[in-house]
């Protein structure tokens, strides 16, 4: 039953895709596209910057860096003590 329903839907979707864009959806002039590239790149850069700042602030506010630093310090001190006792 599912196959009978999915095949016509698949055929309709495939026909729409192969038909191509409608005339109203045709690509604008290439010069307009090139004119908008710097604006799009600036917008992309701004959103990327904002997201990176949010991530960094989240990391700074969390206690993960402090816990990681403490764990490395403790592990380093343990290894150092073990080496001292082993080679003494």
From Swiss-Prot:
It is found in: Secreted. The keyword Kinase does not apply. One of its GO terms (cellular component) is very-low-density lipoprotein particle. Its main location: secreted. One of its GO terms (biological process) is negative regulation of very-low-density lipoprotein particle clearance. Residues 1-26 form the signal peptide. Keywords: Lipid transport, Secreted, Signal, Transport, VLDL. Pfam families: ApoC-I. Gene3D superfamilies: Apolipoprotein C-I. GO terms for molecular function: fatty acid binding; phospholipase inhibitor activity. The keyword Secreted applies. Inhibitor of lipoprotein binding to the low density lipoprotein (LDL) receptor, LDL receptor-related protein, and very low density lipoprotein (VLDL) receptor. Associates with high density lipoproteins (HDL) and the triacylglycerol-rich lipoproteins in the plasma and makes up about 10% of the protein of the VLDL and 2% of that of HDL. Appears to interfere directly with fatty acid uptake and is also the major plasma inhibitor of cholesteryl ester transfer protein (CETP). Binds free fatty acids and reduces their intracellular esterification. Belongs to the apolipoprotein C1 family. This is Apolipoprotein C-I. The gene is APOC1.
